[in-house]
Amino acid sequence: MCRRDGAFRAYLMQDLELFGYTTCEGCPGGNVEYAPEEMKNNGATVIHLATGLVVGYPPCPHLDHFRRFIPEKYGIPVVVGTHPIPQKYLLTHERLGTWNGPEWPELIAPTLADERTRLAYD
């Protein structure tokens, strides 16, 4: 976050403050129902869903639901991703064809950094 890598590069010229972080609490993501409200009450203006939800094997099956549910229930925008996708994950998902569907370019775009950055996150 401090280096503005990955999805945080959208805030290059802004001050950032971390208001909290949590796990999803495992499938089906019970924390997603409550944690955004607490973060919003503490001053968060955007919720970032972890890059791990995208790069996992397989990616989180509830990701699309989470990114629609949070803004609908709490009125706070959601960005998919935090840190850059590591190179080794990108290569594996390319070989597996995981991100070949039409929804994936938009989902991975915020965290798809240049190769040098991806390698630094390996």
Predicted regions and their residues:
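Short, ordered loop/turn segments at secondary-structure junctions
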Residues: 52, 83-85
